[in-house]
Amino acid sequence: MAHIPDGVISWPVLAGGIVTTLAGCAFGLKKLDPVAIPRTAVLSATFFVAALVHFPVGPTSVHLMLNGLIGIVLGWVAVPAILVGLLLQALLFGFGGIIVLGVNTFNLAVPALLCHGLFQLSRRSQHPKIIIATAGACGFLGVGLTAVLVATSLAFSGKEFASAAQLVVFAHLPIMLIETVFTAAAIALLLRVKPEALETDQGQELHLDHVQEDAQGKAYV
């Protein structure tokens, strides 16, 4: 969906996308810890592969995005990670465009950053069910917000794209549901086997080893 081809978006929208993406990448690279480079590479590669299976919808396409999951794990580093994935898709497979790369990155990265913030808020509860449910919501919102941003990009680029903009949003409803389940499951697994991959903003790790069961069988931390 975020793979809008060249020649579709108007120049003012292109310029805005380029400026904001460059700023986001610069900040993301500044935040990148060398220790996290392998993790970043794996998620960027996962994003690259997931989006290769796609179906055309008007001037864009329908496919998995995983930007909610990427945002949860990487935070600001998600911006350069998504940019690299999109660039390789455009160069190797002609999926999307080069000139429009800034807009495509913006449409995916902004929801990813919002999902990261939402997930960090949920972690203050220290309750696994709330955290996992929030992760699922982030999977849904990551796709939904990207659909809205893509539709907005098309709408600001000409009235002829108005109908396509509406179609983009509705066509991704199944993807939203799929990514809800996938993201929740992925975060639940990470919390159990590798919680250090999900550090809080204060650098503290959430461990669920001390989850206990109360008399009613309900889990609490």
Where are the regions that the model predicts?
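Short helix-perturbing small/polar motifs within transmembrane alpha-helices
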Residues: 105-150
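C-terminal transmembrane helix-loop-helix hairpin of multi-pass membrane proteins
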Residues: 134-143, 157, 161-221
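Cytoplasmic-side transmembrane-helix entry/capping segments in multi-pass membrane proteins
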Residues: 35-44, 65-69, 102-109, 130-137
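Interfacial aromatic-anchored transmembrane helix boundaries in multi-pass membrane proteins
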Residues: 52-61, 84-115
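Alpha-helix C-terminal capping segments
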Residues: 70-77
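Small-polar-interrupted transmembrane alpha-helices in polytopic inner-membrane proteins
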Residues: 44-48, 78-91
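Hydrophobic transmembrane alpha-helices
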Residues: 1-69
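Hydrophobic cores of alpha-helical transmembrane segments in multi-pass inner/ER membrane proteins
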Residues: 15-21, 109-118, 177-189
